[in-house]
Amino acid sequence: RWELVAGALSSDPARAAASAADLGIAPERSYSDFAQMALAEAARPDGIDAVAIVTPNHLHAKVATAFLRAGIAVICDKPMTATLPEAEELAALAAETSVPFVLTQTYTGYPMVREARRMIAEGAIGAVRHVQVEYLQDWLAGPVEQSGQKQAVWRTDPGLSGEGGCI
């Protein structure tokens, strides 16, 4: 179990403070800059044990790097980074620092995914020769990003989201 005790919840200091207050985070542990948070929390005797990175994809590498260098364990939302070279650099840094780095793959916990994995491992369905997957999510079916919706803006830009959305 984890307790939320600190956070860099927005790059806007007022919004970060308001979000922290809503979540019960002490004002002195509310940050508007992830690098500042990494250094400050690493210096505290009661500093965080781990950070959860749930930023837009293009920020994962920078944020994870700051916390790994500060000696703070990282729980990073998928994808690891927006590019393969960034992922390779991040993996090397995690190995070099020996600081735990874990990548969330949220669907691995779904019963249907676990059952499929079990069936494949046991040979119950034979050799897997082809996999076809559909991910039905209609909120980005139209040009939502044109309305200024923040999530849609970065998720529909391959330069910010990475190329995984196009695979």
Question: Where are the model-predicted features located?
Answer:
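Short, Asp-centered acidic motifs that coordinate Mg2+ and/or phosphate
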Residues: 6, 50, 130
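Rossmann-like NAD(P)(H) cofactor-binding subdomain of soluble oxidoreductases
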Residues: 59, 79, 102-109
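N-terminal Rossmann-like dinucleotide-binding module
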Residues: 1-24, 46
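Hydrophobic residues in well-ordered beta-strands that form the structural core
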Residues: 76, 82, 101-103, 132
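Predominantly a Rossmann-like dinucleotide-binding segment in NAD(P)-dependent oxidoreductases
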Residues: 107-167
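Rossmann-fold dehydrogenase core element
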Residues: 89-107, 127-130
